[in-house]
């Protein structure tokens, strides 16, 4: 139910790329009052001084205290929010975490992929995966919400409709490409301009850590274990994800049947567009939209998905989940494009 007063929101980690996008979306949200922005490196400065073009004039606070916020959007490095979330929940806030800390239900898998013991494993089963198209009803009563990664978002949109319908084999191959902002705002040698410009390379070929959450969600969709071959690539553009999934239809399944399945799936969301030709990332830049194309080649289904890694693959998905959780219009705060960086 929509609250009579505006929802009070705090963004923790507000000066990283995802945090900046969350802040921008909430600042323009008709049902939300942005009450705190927090970030260690720029603490004490006005937000508008730190983030180009921002109209938010709050002073950036140090620490991790959301104050009296009704909802906390945490955009912190992996392994940080896991220890802080219990305190935020105890203060009565709904927590929307943009890191990987609550995406997995298996604490052992978390340690394998993120290198540390999960400090609050008892919360893993409480967290709801914030992909509205898959978990809309569960999100309506969730207190701990975990925003999917950008690669998983695109991969799941490409594979889940067919797996749910039982029309493909449980063995999928996904080739995905990401812009540089997916690596975060902190400078590093591997994402510097001279290193990535005019060059494309694969990485994580032996296993990308986002694969673990993909496998959990794919298993839920298929009702059985799914074999996933996933290879990500870094490409020299600022933002965007393009994922191409190669799916093997079961005997008798036609291209038209598969397209109808994806059309029905897309019809359940205001943010999914089934398009007539393979999409370009530029068409969804700065938005919470996903463009999905279903193709067919020599008996293999080829499903291509384009999203913005900071939008549908990050902050946009977080705000979409917020809207569902608090009974707001699902498009609230998501009508305009956020184009920095």
Task: Place the predicted regions along the sequence by residue.
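C-terminal substrate-binding/catalytic lobe of Rossmann-fold NAD(P)-dependent dehydrogenases
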Residues: 206-274
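N-terminal Rossmann-like NAD(P) cofactor-binding subdomain of oxidoreductases
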Residues: 1-198, 203-205, 223, 295-297, ...
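Short glycine-rich or small-residue beta-strand-to-loop segments that form or flank ligand, phosphate
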Residues: 8-11, 146, 244-246, 303-306
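Predominant activation on well-ordered alpha-helical scaffold segments within soluble catalytic domains
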Residues: 23, 156-163, 211-215, 259, ...
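Conserved active-site and cofactor/substrate-binding residues in soluble primary-metabolism enzymes
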Residues: 17, 126, 150-157, 205-213, ...
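Short beta-strand or tight-loop elements
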Residues: 127, 226, 288-290
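C-terminal active-site/capping subdomain that shapes the small-molecule cofactor and substrate pocket
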Residues: 246-341
